[in-house]
Amino acid sequence: MLKHLKVPESKAQETKAFLEDCKALNEGFLPIKQDGYVLWPLNFEVEGEIIEFIGSPSNRVSRDYRLKLPLKIRKIAPRAFDIFGNIAIIKLSDESFEYSEIIAESLLSSNPNVDRVALDLGVKGEYRVRDLEMIAGESDFVSVHKENGFEFELDISKVYFSPRLAMERQRVYDMSMEGEQILDAFAGASPFSVALASKGCNITAVDSNPQAEIWSNNNFERNGVSKSNYTFICSKIEDIVSDLPTYDRILMNNPMNSLPYLESLSHKLKSRGVIHLYNIIDKAEKFEIQDFLGSEFECVFEREVHPYSPQSSLKVFDILKSFSTVQSTNQ
């Protein structure tokens, strides 16, 4: 069985371009059409509706790195990994850790655009950055990541950035309108903010990590986006929230710790404004917005962005300060 990304046929080509851009498309297998949907074969998991399906082999050489491993190691090597620019980022179990060098070399030889492999040891510190150890290639965590027509350069060991949110960033970009006032409350290297500012939205980006400010400014310049409608505030959001104005849209991309800030930030939302809340939640748990906010708020959209563990998922919740019809989808 092979992991596939399921998308409507109408979005097949733009999805293919995205998967090729982030090197997630498994060219060893063919896409499968099924009841108005296209199933794209994956090298590694991305956000969206992921299903396991028998792959349809292509005549091209497969880039599944595990096929180059001895059978004993192949069984315990991770299927999924992230790619940030030219860096592959993997998590290893205790069982597979002793084979890290062999696994890393197989990743390098199977992905020609990857020149470094980093071991992900979890998230550390108040700046929620990855605890990384380079296990193959030059010990340099700076790379340039391309997505949705933008380039983001940063040190992935010093600034928060999730390659798996590329389609989510595109979704929010498509929803936004020129002139909107937007608060990016946990900005990191500002991938949301750069794209939205390029569309003419007025952005206030906030992050307490000084490295985030450095790389955010760099990414605005790198993408030729004017800073005339962009302000970066290097601070903890709780220290400045009372002084902030109101916004049409608020981004809360702090999956491990968003909920404690939801109530205070909700007071900074205009009528008919939207909060995009990213939160890791137990798969069996149902999110009830009234457990956190008043009756004037409603969750109008939710979906799984990607699995986080066997028991939990990263989900996005669009919270409207008004009334609307609730919809839920994994597409």
Predicted segments — roles?
Residues 1-331:
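SAM-dependent transferase fold signal centered on methyltransferase-like domains
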